[in-house]
């Protein structure tokens, strides 16, 4: 196990909101691709296993906020997550400002954009 910095449970099981249909989400922190594939081969389809460092930032933040440590030192993991929390703080406002209120709004703006693009480019 020393090839893995941390193993976290996240998602519905970590929040204690799981149902019969819920999968078990496991996140490997500080693991190389070969070790990941080795673990995946041993566990098969029992778990949904992801590499923390390869996930989108918003999912990383959800994991940081709502996880349970299966393996690893909580303090060391917290220190490891510091840089991701800092990046999120720096980007959160821009990310939130670029969200749409609804799918309808997104589609409407996309159509307006495409119409303008067509008008300009011909």
From Swiss-Prot:
Binding site for Mg(2+) 2: 23, 25
Any GO MF annotation of the entry: ATP binding
Pfam families per UniProt: Polbeta (PF18765)
Names of the cofactor(s): Mg(2+)
Free-text cofactor note: Binds 2 Mg(2+) ions.
InterPro entries linked to this entry: NT_sf (IPR043519), Polbeta (IPR041633)
UniProt: Mg(2+) 1 binding residues: 23, 25, 48
Source superkingdom: Archaea
Sorted UniProt keywords: ATP-binding, Magnesium, Metal-binding, Nucleotide-binding, Nucleotidyltransferase, Toxin-antitoxin system, Transferase
EC number of the protein: 2.7.7.108
Bridged cysteine pairs (disulfide): none
Motif (GSX(10)DXD motif): 11-25
Reactions catalysed, as given in the entry: L-tyrosyl-[protein] + ATP = O-(5'-adenylyl)-L-tyrosyl-[protein] + diphosphate; O-(5'-adenylyl)-L-tyrosyl-[protein] + ATP = O-[5'-(adenylyl-(5'->3')-adenylyl)]-L-tyrosyl-[protein] + diphosphate
Family affiliation: Belongs to the MntA antitoxin family.
Main function: Probable antitoxin component of a putative type VII toxin-antitoxin (TA) system. Neutralizes cognate toxic MJ1548 by di-AMPylation.
Subunit note: Probably forms a complex with cognate toxin MJ1548.
UniProt-recorded name of the protein: Putative protein adenylyltransferase MJ1547
């Amino acid at each position: 196990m020393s090839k893995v910095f941390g193993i976290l449970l996240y998602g519905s099981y970590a929040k204690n909101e799981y149902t019969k249909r819920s999968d078990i989400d496991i996140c490997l922190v500080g693991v190389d691709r070969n070790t990941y594939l080795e673990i995946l081969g041993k566990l098969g389809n029992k778990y949904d296993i992801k590499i923390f460092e390869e996930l989108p930032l918003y999912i990383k933040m959800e994991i940081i906020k709502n996880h349970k440590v299966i393996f690893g030192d909580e303090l060391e993991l917290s220190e490891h997550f510091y840089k991701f929390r800092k990046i999120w703080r720096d980007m959160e406002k821009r990310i939130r400002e670029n969200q749409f209120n609804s799918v309808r709004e997104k589609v409407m703006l996309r159509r307006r954009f495409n119409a303008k693009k067509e008008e300009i480019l011909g």
